[in-house]
Amino acid sequence: MTAIRKAGATGNKILLPGNDYTSAGAFISNGSGAALMKVTNLDGSTTNLIFDVHRYLDSDNSGTHMTCTTNNVGDFTNLGKWLRTNKRQAILTETGGGPSDSSCLKAVCEQLDVLNQYSDAYLGWTGWAAGMFASSYELSEVPTKNGNSWTDVPLVTQCIAGKFKK
């Protein structure tokens, strides 16, 4: 932190990942939150120091299964309350589920609704597997080209992009 800030990046946001794959579900209980609360800027403030969390919705939170077994509402509600209490912010930098699986369309949208309810604490989210992933990858969010236009997968349309507050 010191080297980054001393290099002149005083107004830039810096993401602070935790341990245990920076899991939002374990961020408080595994000590990540407590440890990262001690990280400060040169002036002792925590301005622009953002916690970086991940959370998938499959059975083992690995992001390797097409179906979703949880909506993580409890995890993100608890973390959102903790962030508010401690006047801190986080960003969900990895999340996702099966791109057209009905269980994931429901669960991912519900998860992101909670992040919107705590929009003062959560800066946003990033869907995992958007970009140059092979279309055969289980959680691919890569659009398909149809003639001159592109078609997003349902998960992106309904949840990942669809839940951004306007």
Where is each model-derived feature located?
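Extracellular glycoside hydrolase catalytic/binding regions
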Residues: 1-123, 140-159
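C-terminal helix/juxtamembrane-tail motif
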Residues: 159-166
